[in-house]
Each structure stands twice: as C-alpha cells, then as structure tokens.
Curated annotation (Swiss-Prot):
InterPro entries according to UniProt: Mntp/YtaF (IPR003810), Put_MntP (IPR022929)
Name of the protein in question: Putative manganese efflux pump MntP
Family: Belongs to the MntP (TC 9.B.29) family.
Statement: the UniProt record of this protein carries the keyword Transport: yes
HAMAP family, A to Z: MntP_pump (MF_01521)
Main location: membrane
Length: 198
C-alpha cells in the first residue's frame, strides 16, 4: 500500500474524530487552544493505538485467510464507511464545557471514535502494511483534524459535522473497492485496455 493510499485512509478515519471534535468546540464559549490540543492528543493517540492492536491481532490469523484477505479488507472498509455515513445524521449533544473536556469524557469519546481503526489495523495485517509509519500517519492526521474540528466547531457550529462523516465514509468505501479491484485485476485490465486504444 502506497503512502498516498495510507494518507487517504488516515483522512477517512479521522473524519469521525473530526465530527466529534466539532461538537466539543461548539460547547466552548471562547476558543481554548489547550482544549483543542488535548482533544487532538487523545483522539490522535487512540486512533494510532487501535490499528496497532488490530494489526497484532490480524497477524495471528493472516496465514489462514490469505486467499480471501482482499475480500475481508473490502468488507471491513465498506462496513466502516457505511456506518460513518449512517452516523452523520446524529446531531451534537451539547454539554457543559468542563464536562466536555474532562479526562473521562475525552477518553470515552477517543475510544468510541477509534474502534473503527481497530478493524483497519486487522486489514493492514492482511495487506502486509508497514505498521509503524501507518499508525504514525493516522495519529498525526487525526490529531490535526481533531484540533481543527474544535476550532471550526467553536467558530461555525455544526455546519460541517455531518458532511465530514459522509466524506470519511465515502473515502473508506472507495479504498475498500480499490483494494478489491486491484486484487481481482480489474484496475490493471482497465488501464491495459485504455493503453491499447492509445
């Protein structure tokens, strides 16, 4: 898997955290960069840790399902993407600012938004992805989007929340399709056919 593909997956995964971060930003009367950094660290940290755990889990079964690994990757990415699109209909639940940025609240929400990343880690094991650069990229990307989410939520409210989750879902579904089509030779067949016409 190329660095560009990993970045695309990282962006797709981070949209869930981005949407929640917007809600957190909405609860602030005044922008707090401390809270934005804290949110980014929690969300980015969990989002990096969960794929690593998923990868370690996936390596235990990799040898048994090599022949269908592309179907599993396609299925997991598509299901996560569809779920993100469904969740885009949920609206922000506004709570007190102190509660919103408490360690308990941040831990619970960071864990909840990173469960999908656990499944992504399993697909990384099947696709033999270099896991350390992958989780580093996911963590940094999620930190960035979470930080921006708090800022955007504080400035504009929930305007971008649902759109972010829809975009994230579509990205993950698209990557799942690409992995499947790559393995089935559909993409190379299309390019070969186009080259013949040229």
């Amino acid at each position: 898997m190329s660095s560009i593909e990993l970045l695309i997956i990282a962006v797709g995964l981070s949209m869930d955290a981005f949407a929640v971060a917007i809600c957190k930003g909405l609860s602030m009367k005044k922008m707090s960069y401390r809270n934005a950094v804290l949110t980014g660290c929690f969300f980015g940290g969990f989002q990096a840790l969960m794929p690593l755990l998923g990868y370690l889990l996936g390596t235990q079964f990799k040898d048994y399902i090599t022949s269908i690994d592309h179907w599993i990757a396609f299925g997991l990415l598509s299901l996560i993407g569809i779920n993100m699109i469904k969740e885009s209909k949920n609206t922000c639940e506004i709570t007190d600012e102190d509660d919103t940025f408490s360690l308990k609240s941040l831990t619970v929400m960071a864990f909840a938004t990173s469960i999908d990343a656990l499944a992504i880690g399993v697909t990384f094991a099947f696709l033999q992805v270099n896991i350390i650069p992958a989780v580093t990229m996911i963590g940094i990307t999620t930190f960035t989007f979470s930080f921006l989410g708090v800022k955007i939520g504080n400035l504009f409210g929930v305007k971008f929340q649902s759109k972010a989750e829809i975009v994230g879902g579509l990205i993950l579904i698209g990557m799942g399709c690409k992995i499947l089509f790559d393995h089935l030779g559909v993409i190379s067949f299309v390019f070969d056919s186009l080259n013949k016409f040229n």
